[in-house]
Amino acid sequence: MKQAEFEFSISTKGRGIYSIHKEVEDWMGCQSIQSGLLTVFIPHTSASLLIQENADPDVLKDLDRFFNRLVPDGDPLYDHQAEGPDDMPAHIRSALTQTQLSIPAVSYTHLTLPTIYSV
């Protein structure tokens, strides 16, 4: 059994849904793992991880609109405003999604996800 770990950062243009699929598969390509279980973890309280369709950009736009409607910025319900009107909504969105994913990995470089999916 082999265990390996890897840490990376991504730059974003603010709130949104971003793919890290390429970064994860690039790292897997450097490993000598024929099969296993990949755990992806984000150590942040106002960000999260999703596995979602990546073929139709409307899916990501619809998800973004849904979360904006479900948890709007600046809602007077929120007391926590110290880091801006979007911070508490980000914490709530993170609580509604996931901070960790477990994905089967095979063939050295491929996640066992359909080709239209992305992390």
Predicted regions and their residues:
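Active-site histidine-anchored catalytic micro-motif
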Residues: 1-111
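Single conserved hydrophobic/aromatic residue that forms the stacking wall/gate
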Residues: 110-119
